[in-house]
C-alpha cells in the first residue's frame, strides 16, 4: 500500500510552473488530502518511501501549517499559475481530480486538518484575504500566448514553448539509459520510471499490470465501456481525452505535424512518423517466423495472427471472420451501407477516410509515392508497394487449396472464391452474380450502355479497358505475345493462353449440369444457356431473343437491310462476315472438288469430305450419352438436343418451340399458308423443299437409299434409318413413365398419350376424341357408312322398303 502511495505521489502529481520553494508544500498538501479522503491517517509516506507512524501525522500538519503561513502570501502568484497550469500527463483520472480541485476555492482545497488549525489561530479572514479577486480570475482564464505556426493559444508561456516543439520536432530531453528523446522534461521523468521501477498497478479484471496508475485507469475503461469525453460538435464519445483532442482536429482542420521532406501535414504525430518511413524506407519491425518487415508495430502484430491461423474478429451479421479488428470495421459498413466521407469535388462518397484521401489525388493529380527502381510515381502508397513486387518478384499471398501465389491479398481473396463458389456481388437488373466487385461494375455497363474508354487515335469508344488495349495494338501493329511451340504471335495474352490449349488439349471449363468440358470459357457460357434457357440478347424491333450477341447482330441486319460486309475486289456485299469469307474462298462460284464415287461437285473441300463419308460409312463423331455416331459435328450437335431437351427455335405466332430450324420453317408455313415449292409433274405444292424433293422421287421412281441387309430401297433417308432398326432391334426412344422403348419418335409420342390421356384427334360429327389419327380415320369410316345407308333409305320408294321387310 505504501509503495502505491509513493508511486502515486511521484508519478501522478508533477505540475508545471511551480517554483521549487513551493513544491514541497504542494506535494505534502496533496498527500494529506489523499490520506484524509481515505480515512484516518494510519500510515503515511514521504518522498523517500520511509514508513511513518500515525503520531507523526500531527507533526506534519504542524509543519505544513507553518510553511503555509510563511509562504502563502508570497506564493499566491505562483499558486494561481498552479491552479491554471496544464496537466503534464494524459491521465484522465488525474485530470478529473485536478479539475475538481480547481473548481473548488483555495480554502476548500486545503484539507480540513490544516484549514482548522489555521482558522483557529489566525481566523477565517486570513484565508479569505488570500483569495484571488474576480478580475484576477478573469485574467487567469485568458490565453495570451499564441503559437505562430497554428494559432493555438495557451495561458502559460511554458505551455506554448512545449507546444512549439511539436512543429520543430525538437526533443531536447533525452534518457541516459535508453537514449529515447522527449518534447518535455515531465515526459522524460515519467519514462525514467520504466528503468527504475516495475509495474505496480494491476487490473482486477484481467490481471494486466501497468507502470502508471493513469494507464490502469485508462485500461479499466476497456472493461467498463466508459467514454466520458464527448465531442461538442458531433457528440462522439471517447475513453481518453487525448483521443478526443485528436478527433476534434477533424472539425477544426488542424494539422500541426508537418513533414520536413515534402511539406505534407498531419493531424497526429503517429501519422507523421508513419509517413516519414515512406521517405526513409525504414521497416524496423521484423517477423521472427517469415522474416517479413513492417513500418508499424501494429502491422507486425496483425501479421502474427496469420501465422497463428486465428481470425478472432467475427461479423455478427454474416459470420465472416477477420484477422484484424480494422478489417471487421471496414466490412461491417457493407451491411450498414454507411458512406460518411464525401468528395467536395465530384460528390462521390466513401466508407473510409483513407479511400477519400486517395480519391482526392485524382482531382489534384498528386502522386507522392515514387519507385526507387524505375522512377514510376503513384497516387497511393499501397499501389507503390504492390508495384515494387514487380521488381522483387514477391508473391506473398498463397492459396492453401491449390498453392497458387499472388502479389495482392485482394487477388487471393477473389481467387479463393473459385474454390468456395462464393459470388457475393449480384446485378440488380438481371440477377447475374459475380465473385469480384470489379466484374459487377464492368458488367453494369452492359445495361447502362456506358463506354467510358476512348481511343486517342481514332476516337472509337469501348466498354472495357481490355478491348481498348487490344484495339490500340491494331494501330501500333504490336503483337507482344508469342507461342513457344509454333511461334504464332498474338495481340493479347488471353488469346495466347487460349491458343496454347490447341497444343495441350486442355479443357479446363466444365459444365456443372452435364459434366461436358470446354477449352474456352465462352464456349462453356454459351453451352450453359442450353440448360438455363437464357436468351439475354433481345431485338428491340421485333422482340426476338438470342443466346449470343453475335446472333443478335446478324439478326438486326434483317431490319436495317444493311449488307455491312463488302468484298473490296469484286464489290459484293453480304449480311454476315462468314458469308463474305466463304465468298472470298470461292468468288467465281466454281465447284472444283468432285466426288470420285458419284461425280457430285462441291465448292469447298470440307463439304466434299463430309459427302464422302456417306459412301464410306465413316462416322467419327460419337454421342457420349447413347453412343450413336455421326459423320459431322453439326449433326452430332443437333442430335444432342434429344438428350438435353433443348428446343432453341420458337414460333413468334403461337409460341411453339422446335429442336431444329427446319422444323420451325415447316411450321411457320402453317400460319402463312404459303406453299412455295411446286411439283412440275402434277402441280402439287409443298411448304418445305425437302418434301418436294421426296415427292418428285415418286414420279421418277428413284429410291436412292438402300438397305445393306435386305436390299430394300427407300425414297427418304429417314425411312431407311427406321427400317434398319428392324434388323438391329434398336429402339432409342424410351418412355420415362413405363420404360417401354420404340424405334420411332412418332410411336413414342403416340404411346405417351396413354399416360397423359391426351386425345388430340376429334371427330367433327360426334365430338369423340382419339389418341392417334388412324383411330380417328377408322371411326370416321363408320360415320361414312351410316350416312351412306341413310342416303340409300331415303332414295328407295316406300313400297320397296315395306316389301323388303315382308318375308317370302
UniProtKB/Swiss-Prot annotation:
Name the UniProt record assigns to this protein: Zinc finger protein 841
Molecular function terms, GO-annotated: DNA binding; zinc ion binding
Start and end residues, zinc fingers (C2H2-type): 145-167, 173-195, 201-223, 229-251, 257-279, 285-307, 313-335, 341-363, 369-391, 397-419, 425-447, 453-475, 481-503, 509-531, 537-559, 565-587, 593-615, 621-643, 649-671, 677-699, 705-727, 733-755, 761-783
One cellular-component annotation, GO: nucleus
Cross-referenced Pfam families: zf-C2H2, zf-C2H2_6
Biological process terms in GO annotation: regulation of transcription by RNA polymerase II
InterPro entries: Zinc_finger, Znf_C2H2_sf, Znf_C2H2_type
Organism (species): Homo sapiens
Keywords: DNA-binding, Isopeptide bond, Metal-binding, Nucleus, Repeat, Transcription, Transcription regulation, Ubl conjugation, Zinc, Zinc-finger
UniProt KW Ubl conjugation keyword: yes
Primary role: May be involved in transcriptional regulation.
Xref: PROSITE patterns: ZINC_FINGER_C2H2_1, ZINC_FINGER_C2H2_2
Major subcellular location class: nucleus
Subcellular location: Nucleus
Coiled-coil annotated spans: none
Cystine residue pairs: none
Amino acid at each position: 500500500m505504501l509503495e502505491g502511495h509513493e508511486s502515486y505521489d511521484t508519478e501522478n502529481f508533477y505540475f508545471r510552473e511551480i517554483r521549487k520553494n513551493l513544491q514541497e508544500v504542494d506535494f505534502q498538501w496533496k498527500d494529506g488530502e489523499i490520506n484524509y479522503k481515505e480515512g484516518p491517517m494510519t500510515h503515511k509516506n514521504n518522498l523517500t518511501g520511509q514508513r511513518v507512524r500515525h503520531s507523526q501525522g500531527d507533526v506534519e500538519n504542524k509543519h505544513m501549517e507553518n510553511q503555509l503561513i510563511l509562504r502563502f502570501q508570497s506564493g499566491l502568484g505562483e499558486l494561481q499559475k498552479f491552479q491554471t497550469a496544464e496537466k503534464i500527463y494524459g491521465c484522465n483520472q488525474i485530470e478529473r481530480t485536478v479539475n475538481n480541485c480547481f473548481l473548488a476555492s483555495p480554502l476548500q482545497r486545503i484539507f480540513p486538518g490544516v484549514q482548522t488549525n489555521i482558522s483557529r489561530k489566525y481566523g477565517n479572514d486570513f484565508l479569505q484575504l488570500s483569495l484571488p479577486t474576480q478580475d484576477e480570475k478573469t485574467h487567469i482564464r485568458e490565453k495570451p500566448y499564441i503559437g505562430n505556426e497554428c494559432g493555438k493559444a495557451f495561458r502559460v508561456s511554458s505551455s506554448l514553448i512545449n507546444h512549439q516543439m511539436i512543429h520543430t520536432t525538437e526533443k531536447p530531453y533525452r534518457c541516459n539509459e535508453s537514449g529515447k528523446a522527449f518534447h518535455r522534461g515531465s515526459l522524460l521523468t515519467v519514462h525514467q520510471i520504466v528503468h527504475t521501477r516495475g509495474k505496480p498497478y494491476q487490473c482486477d479484471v484481467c490481471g494486466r499490470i501497468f507502470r502508471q496508475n493513469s494507464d490502469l485507469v485508462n485500461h479499466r475503461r476497456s472493461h467498463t465501456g466508459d467514454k466520458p469525453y464527448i465531442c461538442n460538435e458531433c457528440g462522439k464519445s471517447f475513453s481518453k481525452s487525448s483521443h478526443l483532442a485528436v478527433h476534434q482536429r477533424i472539425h477544426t482542420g488542424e494539422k500541426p505535424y508537418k513533414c520536413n521532406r515534402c511539406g505534407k501535414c498531419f493531424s497526429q504525430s503517429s501519422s507523421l512518423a508513419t509517413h516519414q518511413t515512406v521517405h526513409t524506407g525504414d521497416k524496423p519491425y521484423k517477423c521472427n517466423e517469415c522474416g517479413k518487415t513492417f513500418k508499424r508495430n501494429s502491422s507486425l502484430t496483425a501479421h502474427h495472427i496469420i501465422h497463428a491461423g486465428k481470425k478472432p474478429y467475427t461479423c455478427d451479421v454474416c459470420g465472416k471472420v477477420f484477422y484484424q479488428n480494422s478489417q471487421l470495421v471496414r466490412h461491417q459498413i457493407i451491411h450498414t451501407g454507411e458512406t460518411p466521407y464525401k468528395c467536395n469535388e465530384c460528390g462521390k462518397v466513401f466508407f473510409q477516410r483513407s479511400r477519400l484521401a486517395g480519391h482526392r489525388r485524382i482531382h489534384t493529380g498528386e502522386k507522392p509515392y515514387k519507385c526507387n527502381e524505375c522512377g514510376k510515381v503513384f497516387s497511393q502508397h499501397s499501389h507503390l508497394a504492390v508495384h515494387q513486387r514487380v521488381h522483387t518478384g514477391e508473391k506473398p499471398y498463397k492459396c492453401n487449396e491449390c498453392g497458387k501465389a499472388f502479389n495482392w491479398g485482394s487477388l487471393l481473396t477473389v481467387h479463393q472464391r473459385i474454390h468456395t463458389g462464393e459470388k457475393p456481388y449480384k446485378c440488380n437488373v438481371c440477377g447475374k452474380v459475380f465473385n469480384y466487385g470489379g466484374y459487377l461494375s464492368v458488367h453494369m455497363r452492359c445495361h447502362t450502355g456506358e463506354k467510358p474508354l476512348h481511343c486517342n487515335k481514332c476516337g472509337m469508344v469501348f466498354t472495357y479497358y481490355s478491348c481498348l488495349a487490344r484495339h490500340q495494338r491494331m494501330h501500333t501493329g504490336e503483337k507482344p505475345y508469342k507461342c513457344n511451340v509454333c511461334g504464332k504471335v498474338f495481340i493479347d495474352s488471353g488469346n495466347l493462353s487460349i491458343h496454347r490449349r490447341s497444343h495441350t488439349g486442355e479443357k479446363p471449363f466444365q459444365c456443372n449440369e452435364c459434366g461436358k468440358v470446354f477449352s474456352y470459357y465462352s464456349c462453356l457460357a454459351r453451352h450453359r444457356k442450353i440448360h438455363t434457357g437464357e436468351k439475354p440478347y433481345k431485338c428491340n424491333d421485333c422482340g426476338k431473343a438470342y443466346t449470343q450477341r453475335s446472333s443478335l447482330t446478324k439478326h438486326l441486319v434483317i431490319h436495317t437491310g444493311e449488307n455491312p460486309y463488302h468484298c473490296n475486289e469484286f464489290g459484293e456485299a453480304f449480311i454476315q462476315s462468314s458469308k463474305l469469307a466463304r465468298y472470298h474462298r470461292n468468288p467465281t462460284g466454281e465447284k472444283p472438288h468432285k466426288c470420285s464415287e458419284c461425280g457430285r461437285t462441291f465448292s469447298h473441300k470440307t463439304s466434299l469430305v463430309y459427302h464422302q463419308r456417306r459412301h464410306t460409312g465413316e462416322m467419327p463423331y460419337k454421342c457420349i450419352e447413347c453412343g450413336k455416331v455421326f459423320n459431322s459435328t453439326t449433326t452430332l450437335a443437333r442430335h444432342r438436343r434429344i438428350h438435353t431437351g433443348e428446343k432453341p427455335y420458337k414460333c413468334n405466332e403461337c409460341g411453339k418451340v422446335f429442336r431444329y430450324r427446319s422444323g420451325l420453317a415447316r411450321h411457320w408455313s402453317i400460319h402463312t399458308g404459303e406453299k412455295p415449292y411446286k411439283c412440275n409433274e402434277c402441280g402439287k405444292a409443298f411448304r418445305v423443299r425437302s418434301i418436294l424433293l421426296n415427292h418428285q422421287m415418286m414420279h421418277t421412281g428413284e429410291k436412292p437409299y438402300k438397305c445393306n441387309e435386305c436390299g430394300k430401297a427407300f425414297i427418304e433417308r429417314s425411312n431407311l434409318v427406321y427400317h434398319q432398326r428392324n434388323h438391329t432391334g434398336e429402339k432409342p426412344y424410351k418412355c420415362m413413365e413405363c420404360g417401354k422403348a420404340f424405334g420411332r419418335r412418332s410411336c413414342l409420342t403416340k404411346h405417351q398419350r396413354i399416360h397423359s390421356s391426351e386425345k388430340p384427334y376429334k371427330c367433327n360429327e360426334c365430338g369423340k376424341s382419339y389418341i392417334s389419327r388412324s383411330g380417328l380415320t377408322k371411326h370416321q369410316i363408320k360415320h361414312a357408312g351410316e350416312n351412306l345407308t341413310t342416303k340409300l333409305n331415303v332414295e328407295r320408294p316406300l313400297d320397296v322398303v315395306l316389301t323388303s321387310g315382308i318375308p317370302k
